[in-house]
Amino acid sequence: MNTLSKSSLSYCGAELRRHDHDRFLTCLFAPATRREALYALYTFNLEVARTAEVVSEPMIGQIRLQWWRDAVAEIYEGRPRQHQVVQPLAEAVQAHSLTRSHFARLIDGREQDLDSDPPEDLAALEGYAEATGASLVRLALEILGVTRSAGEAAFAAGRHVGIAWALTGLLRAVPFHAQQKRLYLPVDVCARRDVSPGDLFELRSSPELARATEEIAVSAEAHLVEAYKLRHQVPAVARPALLLATLAGGYLKTLRRAAFDPFAPAVQADAPGRAWRLTWAALRRRF
């Protein structure tokens, strides 16, 4: 793994290091020739993912997402905008022939962040996780040189890793979303576990919330298990995009040790020894 000083990082690299350190660390295990493209892709994701946080009303959020749809369209038309993320993203798209539909699916998935209604059920939540998480992993795999003919196992594993990572992130973000009066816990899960959104929005943990959290965590763990089953079929070049599985597994174990209380300080903290954990997984040729 390469350690990089802040001064040596590009704009996208610096943004990723500051705002999505987990993904930044996984990039350091990618070949140097692919790293800037990963930085650009993941920083694009940052820009799209923070939409609901930086706008005051859904209509403005829709305008922001449309800006990114148009920016991606212009990249594929060969006339990228002058923008500090769009330009390097355009270089990544051109250099690695990235599939346009995955960008569209990711942006469309983020529209759900602007909807005040929670997902109806776990299937709907997993659909959101697949659109926003798995699509991003798929693009990262393309940057790393995974091809359709040789990479079916990698793409299948990537789908499971992307969903697991997104679900894990949503569970860890329950307090943050509650402060914004946003709820991602499915309606049917909340009803089944007697979770009161009112209590949640007052930032109160409860046994009922823990049971709902556990149900979603078990789903995330199941996706990791499915990804792990494919380990020996995944080409080595794909592993940097799948290393998030190592971190997701660690976060889920912490959540389990905290009795599935998303408000527990340990759950909110960054995983200790993240870099070493990733290094150990990479040395063992795992993810």
Predicted regions mapped to residue ranges:
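Acidic/His metal-coordination segments adjacent to aromatic residues that form catalytic metal sites
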Residues: 111-124, 205
